[in-house]
């Protein structure tokens, strides 16, 4: 299957320039193509992952991906999709973010073989461009009326936009032109909000490299959820690729909780499963939704891809323990990962009455509420229901003498460590 046909089947194309030309080009040649990300933070979230999944599909089809980390453009900030001016970050912070993103992106692509990926930083070719060179060599090629008509800029005209952000599309166009000239890069991929920036790059390439220069642009649809909420967010915030921000267990749980109405779409977008495999899972969503086979497959595939097989196994073990309530089977290390973001308390290394202990730690707001919850069977210690108001908490209630896991009700967990 032609890579363009595959992307269309997966619902991953929103707009493209010269569709037939691109289709023919990728059939006849191995091409280089790129996608960029600005280091506005020290970690990607799963929303950032979407265009890079497309880039990886091109690599699987035998093409050469170029991953651009925007050390230069990141100093300015892309106005796309922003209602107000971005706050500028220090160069030191941007440099740290660049390195963090390089590590994350390095896990997603293959950097060896005939279709080896490469990683570049646009700061390398932008840092020595003087303001006069910028205005003469590049600014001269851009018509202000055309720039104002771009959706990126037009949406900001009422509230105002600085020249810094207004000029962002010129810098991104410079990137595409540079990669075309020095890396034979023929295609830029981006989100649907990047169309204006991508077409600006194509215009610059034609002006700098000649009218016959062959270059293409492709954008990806905005991924939406069936319930109308923003993709990539959970109740706790963004789902990060950095395991210190979102543990592999939390990452796995995000995917396994996917709505039946969204799961087939996500399987197409995010996994490398074949059409036949996804069709089979789609049937199971219709006939046996309670088994959640599609969600389990999606969660497993994504956790392996972003983290590792070992991380998946650990996430499965934690999930099983929490589902069964047998949290005693978890090691202290697994508890630290699985309960990383639950409310955590530090208790004295001494015995105490359960009711007093819950109130002293702050798990319960009052003795009255604590007695009510214990008496009603709403309190679980290490997975075991405790209804004895006279129970004494001691060393036997600790896992590996480090942690006690408290559950209130069905889902509210607390982690207690000891001084």
From Swiss-Prot:
GO terms for cellular component: cytosol. GO terms for molecular function: ATP binding; RNA binding; tyrosine-tRNA ligase activity. CDD domains: S4, TyrRS_core. PROSITE patterns: AA_TRNA_LIGASE_I (PS00178), S4 (PS50889). A motif ('HIGH' region) lies at residues 39-48. It catalyses: tRNA(Tyr) + L-tyrosine + ATP = L-tyrosyl-tRNA(Tyr) + AMP + diphosphate + H(+). The keyword Nucleotide-binding applies. Belongs to the class-I aminoacyl-tRNA synthetase family. TyrS type 1 subfamily. This is Tyrosine--tRNA ligase. It comes from Listeria monocytogenes serovar 1/2a (strain ATCC BAA-679 / EGD-e). The gene is tyrS.
């Amino acid at each position: 299957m032609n890579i363009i046909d595959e992307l269309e089947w997966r619902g991953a194309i929103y707009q493209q320039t010269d569709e037939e030309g691109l289709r023919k080009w990728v059939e006849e040649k191995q091409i280089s193509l790129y996608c960029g990300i600005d280091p506005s933070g020290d970690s990607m979230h799963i929303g950032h992952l979407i265009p890079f999944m497309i880039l990886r599909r091109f690599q699987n089809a035998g093409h050469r991906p170029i991953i651009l980390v925007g050390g230069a453009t990141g100093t300015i900030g892309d106005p796309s999709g922003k209602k107000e001016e971005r706050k500028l970050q220090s160069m030191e912070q941007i440099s740290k973010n660049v390195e963090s993103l390089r590590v994350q992106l390095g896990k997603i692509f293959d950097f060896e073989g005939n279709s080896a990926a490469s990683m570049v930083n646009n700061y390398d070719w932008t840092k020595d461009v003087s303001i006069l060179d910028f205005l003469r060599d590049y600014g001269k090629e851009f018509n202000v009326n055309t720039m104002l008509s771009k959706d990126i800029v037009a949406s900001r005209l009422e509230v105002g936009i600085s020249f810094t952000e207004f000029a962002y599309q010129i810098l991104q166009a410079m990137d595409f032109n540079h990669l075309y000239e020095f890396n034979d890069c023929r295609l830029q991929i981006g989100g649907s909000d990047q169309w204006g920036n991508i077409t600006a790059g194509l215009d610059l390439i034609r002006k700098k490299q000649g009218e016959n220069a062959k270059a293409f642009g492709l954008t990806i649809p905005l991924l939406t959820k069936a319930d109308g909420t923003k993709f990539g967010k959970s109740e706790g915030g963004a789902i990060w690729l950095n395991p210190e921000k979102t543990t592999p267990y939390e990452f796995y749980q995000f995917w396994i909780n996917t709505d039946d109405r969204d799961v087939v779409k996500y399987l197409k977008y995010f996994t490398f499963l074949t059409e036949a495999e996804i069709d089979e899972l789609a049937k199971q969503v219709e006939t046996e939704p309670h088994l959640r086979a599609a969600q389990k497959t999606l969660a497993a595939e994504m956790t392996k891809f972003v983290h590792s097989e070992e991380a998946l196994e650990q996430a499965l073990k934690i999930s099983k323990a929490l589902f069964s309530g047998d949290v005693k089977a978890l090691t202290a290390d697994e508890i630290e990962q699985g309960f990383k973001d639950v409310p955590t308390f530090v208790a004295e290394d001494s015995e105490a009455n359960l009711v007093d202990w819950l109130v002293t730690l702050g798990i319960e707001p009052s003795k009255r509420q604590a007695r009510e919850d214990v008496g009603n069977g709403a309190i679980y210690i290490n997975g075991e229901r405790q209804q004895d108001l006279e129970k004494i908490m001691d060393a036997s209630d600790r896992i590996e003498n480090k942690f006690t896991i408290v559950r209130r009700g069905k889902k509210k967990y607390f982690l207690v460590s000891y001084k």
